[in-house]
Amino acid sequence: MEETIEDPPTSAVLLDHCHFSQVIFSSVEKFYIPGGDVTCHYTFTQHFIPRRKDWIGIFRVGWKTTREYYTFMWVTLPIDLNNKSAKQQEVQFKAYYLPKDDEYYQFCYVDQDGVVRGASIPFQFRPENEEDILVVTTQGEVEEIEQHNKELCKENQELKDNCVSLQKQNSDMQAELQKKQEELETLQSINKKLELKVKEQKDYWETELLQLKEQNQKMSSENEKMGIRVDQLQAQLSTQEKEMEKLVQGDQDKTEQLEQLKKENDHLFLSLTEQRKDQKKLEQTVEQMKQNETTAMKKQQELMDENFDLSKRLSENKIICNALQREKERLEGENDLLKRENSRLLSYMGLDFNSLPYQVPTSDEGGAGQNPGLVYGNPYSGIQESSSPSPLSIKKCPICKADDICDHILEQQQMQPLCLNCPICDKIFPATEKQIFEDHVFCHSL
């Protein structure tokens, strides 16, 4: 499949949040035959604009998020969106990457934000000749899938309710945290104002005390009144100090609560990070299993090719063997004919074929003059090699009184051409080129 190593953009968007009607799939079959490429036809609606990272995936029926795709192909962007033909597009899925089971699947168009923009009707991957058998099973599976979809919708609604509850709880906590922060800022501002006021008032009191001391020296009669005034001011200062301590203690409590909320937030973030790591490990495991499956199928194909080559060579060897067997039978037939012809000629000459020496010469006797293609050899080799003809082996013709009847027969036999025929290509070789003939036949088996 012509897809890049980069994973497509996905999201955990729920089914109710998708816009399935913005891309329309057409010409979707009820089932596709395994082993063949599948072409997906789709059409963009008027207000939908495709983007570069959009993709079409094959999902098993009952999927929840776009991360559950089986395989995908990138979408080809049309050159002119205003053209009507540009709205109708297609993409082809290679047979090797398609599902191998008979579950129900559907095409889904996903944009680069991971949001589903269109979904097709369900279909299967199964052989065509099983259509009649699968009619009842398909209906049962459809009912089972509908029941499963109802359960998934119910579970989905529960998850959405939980999600809304968690979102509301999170929103309340954020609002409470914001409120606490505002209160803390207000308290800090009040604290600063009080500190400034206390400092100013303390300075004022010190100045007033100094003035009172100066006045004490001048007005001894008013000393008691000023002492009472000092006591009152000191009591007021003590009360304000206690109030300030309470405010400081409240500020510390709010700070501790804020730290506790920060710790809880960090704990939740760490938990989310661990879950993402586990999900990434699972995705890597799935990818490794796909690679192992690809390697095994390649190895199986290589073994099948090797088995085919061996079968082909075995068939060729059988053909050569049969051809050699036929050639052997033909040569044996020719030898039998030659033996009968020799017996006839010897009978005509008055000689007994069985009483002749050198009838079946060995490899050391007369080997140079024999035909390498014959099994029984030349029956006249002994007569040709003798230095003088025996009176018992040669008879004169009673009619013509000729002594050269044997020479005539030998001359006629030597004039007969002996050839070797290739049983495969029918090429003819002289009898003296037996080695070349054998090398030629052996080359056919390579």
From Swiss-Prot:
Family to which this protein belongs: Belongs to the CALCOCO family.
Intervals of motif CLIR: 133-136
PANTHER family: CALCIUM-BINDING AND COILED-COIL DOMAIN-CONTAINING PROTEIN 2, SKICH DOMAIN-CONTAINING PROTEIN
Region ranges (Interaction with MYO6): 395-446
Name assigned to this protein: Calcium-binding and coiled-coil domain-containing protein 2
GO terms (BP aspect): positive regulation of autophagosome maturation; xenophagy
Keyword Zinc-finger: yes
Pfam families for this protein: SKICH
Motif (LIR-like): 203-206
Membrane-topology annotation of the record: Peripheral membrane protein
Source species: Pongo abelii (Sumatran orangutan)
GO cellular component, one term: cytoskeleton
GO MF assignments: zinc ion binding
Biological role stated in the UniProt entry: Xenophagy-specific receptor required for autophagy-mediated intracellular bacteria degradation. Acts as an effector protein of galectin-sensed membrane damage that restricts the proliferation of infecting pathogens upon entry into the cytosol by targeting LGALS8-associated bacteria for autophagy. Initially orchestrates bacteria targeting to autophagosomes and subsequently ensures pathogen degradation by regulating pathogen-containing autophagosome maturation.
Superkingdom of origin: Eukaryota
Zinc finger (UBZ1-type): 419-444
Modified residues (Phosphoserine): S445
Binding site for Zn(2+): C422, C425, H440, H444
Subunit structure, interactors included: Dimer. Part of a complex consisting of CALCOCO2, TAX1BP1 and MYO6. Interacts with MYO6. Interacts with GEMIN4. Interacts with ATG8 family members MAP1LC3A, MAP1LC3B, GABARAP, GABARAPL1 and GABARAPL2. Interacts with ATG8 family member MAP1LC3C. Interacts with LGALS8. Interacts with TOM1; the interaction is indirect and is mediated by MYO6, which acts as a bridge between TOM1 and CALCOCO2. Interacts with AZI2.
Keywords for this protein: Autophagy, Coiled coil, Cytoplasm, Cytoplasmic vesicle, Cytoskeleton, Membrane, Metal-binding, Phosphoprotein, Zinc, Zinc-finger
Chief place where the protein resides: cytoplasm
Interaction with LGALS8: annotated segments: 371-381
Domain notes: The MYO6-binding domain is required for autophagy-mediated degradation of infecting bacteria such as Salmonella typhimurium, but not for bacteria targeting to autophagosomes.
Record carries keyword Cytoplasm: yes
